[in-house]
Amino acid sequence: VTTNYLETMKAGLIGIIFSMAALQLAAQKNCVSHSYEQEQISIDRSLKDRNNAIESFVKNQLAQGSVLRTEGAESVFKIPVVVHILYHYPSEKISDEQVYSQIDALNKAFRRKNADTANTPSWFRPLAADCEIEFQLAISDPSCRSTSGIIRKYTPIKRWEANDKMKFSSEMGSDAWDSKSYLNIWVCNLESVAGYSSVMGGPAEKDGIVIGFSAFGTNTGMAGYDMGKTAVHEVGHWLGLRHLWGDEYCGDDGIADTPKQAGNNVGCPTGIRASCNNGSTGDMYMNYMDFTSDACMNLFTKGQKEKMRALFATGGLRNPLLSSKGLQMPLIMESPLPEQDPKWLEV
């Protein structure tokens, strides 16, 4: 009886802890991509130069007008995705259906096919864009074996920080697949952090995005973050976009058609919310690169589309993804080696 009582108390305490973490995350969308970038640059000073070189490449592509303007199926970039799910508690071991819902949310956002695009204010609608970028779970792994594109690993780590340790098996995480062929997404317990993205020009083994398990996919029960748009925001970073306010007061995100704004917006604003002399339109708080609730985010702009797609031009950082074998028929029609119980957990 005593043992059962203790187990019941333990389960109750775990539930309370998860509820507290959920409330803390729901209070504000906490993307730490900028602070992560600054930390990585402080560790590796050359990273800033590599990042600047990529930004210069993008500017040159845009200046030359060489970003693909064609429309139709051939102009849609398809990105193979591998999702690394790291769980300690059963609630963190998200289902295939939850993963599918996130891929669907990414595709609807980047193709502007969400029903809530009808909520875009009339003065911003002419700027909204179908980015013609799609995402698909990989069907071939780096060894050309068949895969579901989903990896699950039990880990003894209960909480992760934005320090990339979840990206390495040696740290009880999961190693990245070749970043030239796949978008790596790690899903784990980040506590109060919603997610973050790697830095352009950073190490290949760290390339990708990390999302808190409670903000991944749709209908998660996480109030304000249950439509999969945290991942949309972080993939925006992964494709070169910055926060609208340029991470400083009235800063510049480098995109001509996004109005300057004083800082991030939260919750679900309405009407014109003016700052930084943008009174004619106000802040573009419904843009995916702000911090508003999922239900209030519904657009990327044409300028953001052009910048993201410039990375896929010949010689661009993301160009190799277009020739990835991740979406090609696997040569070996068998599942990869079991990954539910990695060797470092065998007893």
Model-identified regions with their sequence ranges:
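Active-site-proximal segment of zinc-dependent metalloprotease catalytic domains
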Residues: A162-H243
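Structural recognition of the beta-strand scaffold that forms the well-ordered cores
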Residues: K78-I85, E134-L137, Y182-V187, G208-F213, ...
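Stable alpha-helical elements in mature extracytoplasmic
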Residues: Q98-Q102, M227-A231, T301-Q304, L317
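A recurrent domain-boundary module in secreted/ectodomain proteins
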Residues: T301-E346
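The catalytic-center signature of Zn2+-dependent metalloproteases
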Residues: A223-N298
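Sec-exported extracytoplasmic/periplasmic mature domains
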Residues: D104-A115, H237-L244, A313, L317
